[in-house]
């Protein structure tokens, strides 16, 4: 089908409604509230998952590190919600953009490093030189450790971008193959449709796991500097 110059700017619709409205209305469903004294199963399960995740990340932190609990909880919920919303048709996943992931990773990483330099500067600087290093290797190891320190936010952002983008590309390719095979070979279409369904389930798991991994690594950086 031929497209004009303004096709990329056309607002996508679902059942006659702008997709943006549906995307905006979806996040409140992830944080339901109950008017009853006793919460229902959905809210109870959600609160249990948040407490479990927070416990896993905060169990090794001291008092200063635990002040980040609200920040880390908000971060994992934001990334998980963004990844899951990107799996909907006619939607866009911001976490596939390296610029956005860098915008999240660099300030968080810089905050942990600044916290370490403020409260325990000697220990933080000591990480640049492993104990027992031979004297001739000291300059080289300091340079290597410094480079590895500055690569941490880049690794955070690239890991999230690559995993989310790869999954979306696979879903797009298999989905296109399913539509192509629909008029050619019905049994093969059923096979590709089954693969697409399994891949979608896998991508839901990847969306949640990548949110947890990103937040957990930030938590580990915080633990090293608090």
From Swiss-Prot:
It catalyses: H(+)(in) = H(+)(out). The keyword Isomerase does not apply. One of its GO terms (biological process) is proton transmembrane transport. The chain crosses the membrane at residues 12-32, 68-88, 97-117, 138-158, 164-184, 189-209. SUPFAM superfamilies: F1F0 ATP synthase subunit A. The keyword Ion transport applies. InterPro entries: ATP_synth_F0_asu, ATP_synth_F0_asu_AS, ATP_synth_F0_asu_bact/mt, F0_ATP_A_sf. It is a multi-pass membrane protein. GO terms for molecular function: proton channel activity; proton-transporting ATP synthase activity, rotational mechanism. Signal peptide: none annotated. Keywords: ATP synthesis, CF(0), Hydrogen ion transport, Ion transport, Membrane, Mitochondrion, Mitochondrion inner membrane, Transmembrane, Transmembrane helix, Transport. CDD domains: ATP-synt_Fo_a_6. GO terms for cellular component: mitochondrial inner membrane; proton-transporting ATP synthase complex. Pfam families: ATP-synt_A. It is found in: Mitochondrion inner membrane. It comes from the Eukaryota. Belongs to the ATPase A chain family. Subunit a, of the mitochondrial membrane ATP synthase complex (F(1)F(0) ATP synthase or Complex V) that produces ATP from ADP in the presence of a proton gradient across the membrane which is generated by electron transport complexes of the respiratory chain. ATP synthase complex consist of a soluble F(1) head domain - the catalytic core - and a membrane F(1) domain - the membrane proton channel. These two domains are linked by a central stalk rotating inside the F(1) region and a stationary peripheral stalk. Component of the ATP synthase complex composed at least of ATP5F1A/subunit alpha, ATP5F1B/subunit beta, ATP5MC1/subunit c (homooctomer), MT-ATP6/subunit a, MT-ATP8/subunit 8, ATP5ME/subunit e, ATP5MF/subunit f, ATP5MG/subunit g, ATP5MK/subunit k, ATP5MJ/subunit j, ATP5F1C/subunit gamma, ATP5F1D/subunit delta, ATP5F1E/subunit epsilon, ATP5PF/subunit F6, ATP5PB/subunit b, ATP5PD/subunit d, ATP5PO/subunit OSCP. This is ATP synthase F(0) complex subunit a. It comes from Pongo pygmaeus.
